[in-house]
Amino acid sequence: TIHAIGKGLLIAEIQQNSNVTYRVYDYGRRDAQGNTRPLHVEKALEVSDLTRAADAVEPTQVVVDGGVFTEVSTCQYFTVTELKADGTVAVGKPDTFTAVLVLEGEGTIDGEAFGRYDTFFIPADAGEVKLSGCFKALLSTL
């Protein structure tokens, strides 16, 4: 996926691991030795499909005591759900991990405090975990 990150943006780059990055532009940045970093324009063009568009996602909401879960993106590799919590909610699935990125607010998980931009991982074998507080987070699962 060709993309850029501009000043002042916060992104959550949730993707299948590929271990490949092709740099098509680098803003003149330099490495530790002062050299410009290599660009990979030809390689990037070889593997890019510029005609493909993502399917539109019709967000689905599940309202529970203490919060609202909204599925914002799903594909064969992962699902991303936004959680808006104002109380205590159960998070976690028995068949997959849950990666949590807190976007706003604060809360606790098992007595441990978390806040804006904190990230934590709930293993599949943890079962349901209680999150408490007033916060917004992205939950990523397989």
Regions found by a protein language model. Name each.
Residues 1-2, 109-128:
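Short acidic-glycine-tyrosine-enriched beta hairpin
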Residues 22-88, 93-94:
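C-terminal amphipathic alpha-helical segment
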